Amino acid sequence: MADALKDVPFKTVQVDALVAIKIATASGKAFPSLATGSLVGMEKNGVLEITNSFPYPEINTASADGQNDTAANLSAAAPRAKQNIAYGNEMIKFLREVNVDANNVGWYTSTSMGNFVNLNTIENQFYYQSQLNERTVALIYDVSRSSQGTLNLRAYRLSPSFVTAYKEGKFTTESLQKSSLRYQDILVELPVTVHNSHLLTSLLHQLPSEAPKEELSFPPNLAALQQDPNTPLPPLFPNYDALDLSIDPFLEKTCDLLLESIENHHTELNNYQYYQRQLAREQTKITAWQQKRKAENAARTASKQPLLPEDEWQRLFKLPAEPSRLETLLNSRQVEQYSRQVDGFAAGVTSKMFAVKSNLLPGE
């Protein structure tokens, strides 16, 4: 993690609680569609502080330029759409007029079950890092994971090596070997912290509870006061619902998505193997033609006739174009993302099973 962060202009991302609530609200309303928006804030002492956000307006599919674009594709590409860029610039102008942070520091998008490693995410973040502001970040909010009661908000940036390769637009086997680019080098994850102001923290501790309906006796001691059900609990009190022994339903769904990504990965590998077979057949034909032409030129030399050109094969034969390896890299990175989620789910389920093992298996 430290090696990946050494070339990043900032080391951590600090998100205001109000921004996290805005992102969660917009993502929940748009679910199962994607919700995207812009982030504003400032960088201070190696920390990217995100202090405000605003969602992008919904794109009408009837007024879109492309006839084949679906609503999902338009929503995913919203951060780099021309109308949304103009909308974001206008919003930042208004924010500057009211004297609040008005620096574009990135964008956010919602996802489900960690399914965000795709070409749209890469193109959006590349646009922000290369054209708007190099010091930008992408916040990924997982609606499905957050519905379990734990905020799932992650920050990512494109690595410098991947940005260089993406600018060149060459993702062939030779270019990947020269640059030593791996699927682990596509995205760099940054630690995220949620920040509350002191006033908000004080308010959380002073929130009144519901008034009792009958007169209560004065508690004789502190222990009785702590055991009183009418005593308000402190904020962020532990939630014991997480101790439920039922198998997490998201584990099964994540496994299905993992298998689907593996199938897509095998499809890309089969396409590349087909290209290699086609290339080998063409190279065999070219080699046979060159040997035949050399034999003809040897006979012409013996008979003192003019030689035939030996580079004519370039006009007669056409080598197949190598398919881009970018999709394979993205599929590999998505498989890794799902594997991490399965590992996290399995750890919680396994610990619960070991905790109740003595009650489930008699005699142990």
From Swiss-Prot:
Gene3D superfamilies: Cytidine Deaminase, domain 2. Belongs to the eIF-3 subunit H family. Residues 13-162 form the MPN domain. The keyword Transport does not apply. Keywords: Cytoplasm, Initiation factor, Protein biosynthesis. CDD domains: MPN_eIF3h (cd08065). This is Eukaryotic translation initiation factor 3 subunit H. GO terms for cellular component: eukaryotic 43S preinitiation complex; eukaryotic 48S preinitiation complex; eukaryotic translation initiation factor 3 complex. It comes from Phaeosphaeria nodorum (strain SN15 / ATCC MYA-4574 / FGSC 10173). The keyword Chaperone does not apply. GO terms for biological process: formation of cytoplasmic translation initiation complex; translational initiation. Component of the eukaryotic translation initiation factor 3 (eIF-3) complex, which is involved in protein synthesis of a specialized repertoire of mRNAs and, together with other initiation factors, stimulates binding of mRNA and methionyl-tRNAi to the 40S ribosome. The eIF-3 complex specifically targets and initiates translation of a subset of mRNAs involved in cell proliferation.
